């Protein structure tokens, strides 16, 4: 059984890594997980190339849920999705959810075998 992968995208590499660390400690290693954040010199920012690489690292035939912090992360995630092969695009979604809580609940759902739509819906239920 394929498990939905999770990608965490933050402008801060420390935030992205910290959120990923929380996910790992709470759900273990079975959920495909990748994170990316910051610019090439460690400054704040995001890169659609790095996001594309993270999607590939977390890839699962069950799909990939992306959690982002701010607008630029979402825009670059959308660009990264558009750069994927056509057959993969429909299996990658951006969740409108708080990055830390959303990543944890999305990974928890994924670890239980939930499909991509359920993972996304559950994460987005955390939004105000």
Features from the language model and the residues they span:
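N-terminal loops that bind phosphate or other acidic moieties
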Residues: 1-128
């Amino acid at each position: 059984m394929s498990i939905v992968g999770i990608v965490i995208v933050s402008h801060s590499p420390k935030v992205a890594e910290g959120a990923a660390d929380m996910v790992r400690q709470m759900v273990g290693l079975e959920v495909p997980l990748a994170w990316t954040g910051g610019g090439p010199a460690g400054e704040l920012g995001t890169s659609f190339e790095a996001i594309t690489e993270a999607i590939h690292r977390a890839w699962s035939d069950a799909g990939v849920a992306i959690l982002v912090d701010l607008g630029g992360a979402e825009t670059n995630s959308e660009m990264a999705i558009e750069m994927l092969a056509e057959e993969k695009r429909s299996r990658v979604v951006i969740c409108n959810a708080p990055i830390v809580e959303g990543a944890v609940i999305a990974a928890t759902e994924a670890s239980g075998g939930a499909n991509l739509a359920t993972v996304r819906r559950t994460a987005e239920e955390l939004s105000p």
